[in-house]
Amino acid sequence: MALSALSTLQAAELPITKNSPIPDFQNRTQDVAPYDFDAPPQGLFRTITTAEGFDEELGLHRTHEIVPVKPTTLFSPDTQAVFIVFYLHQHYQGFQVFGRCYPEAVAGLDPTVVIGQDAMHIALEDDSGYLTLSPPKGAWKPGRYKVEIHVGEQVNEMSLMGTMRFTIVAEKR
């Protein structure tokens, strides 16, 4: 009985805090930058880059690590493939990374039509990967291309993570 009286006495002595408005606990809009889906993806991706190729190396924990070879955003029209190589933060389930290529500023091509795409399944133990984009109809036309990066089980309006860009430069004569 004496123990419960003591705890009641201590509880009664606690100060009462004022009711704070909910905005005091929320992020202020001026402190939060909006996410840009028209820029390289962030969040899940530690790094992501376009490259002329990739190598597979043995990682720190004896895992397969995909590393870019000759990272660049400028390619020649005779390039056999453009690679998008990425490193991921830790994740807790498998998923797919999709790349959908559009001709953003290429003469004679509709910028709304997908001209190439690739997907890679990422297993739980994977921390890197790559996408391969082959030229449409055998050769790249000079101009700027954009690649939408999607993550999930399928491509839809909610799976877009960001956009990568590369340029095919005209050959020097």
Language model region names:
Residues 99-103, 149:
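Conserved aromatic beta-strand anchor motif in extracellular beta-sandwich/beta-rich domains
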Residues 111-125:
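Solvent-exposed serine/threonine-rich low-complexity stretches and specific carbohydrate-binding patches
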Residues 14-59:
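A eukaryote-biased signal for short, well-structured alpha-helical docking elements
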Residues 143-150:
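A short tyrosine-centered beta-strand micro-motif
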Residues 59-93:
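Contiguous beta-strand segments within globular domains
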Residues 157-173:
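Short beta-strand elements
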Residues 123-134:
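Aromatic sugar-binding surface patches on proteins
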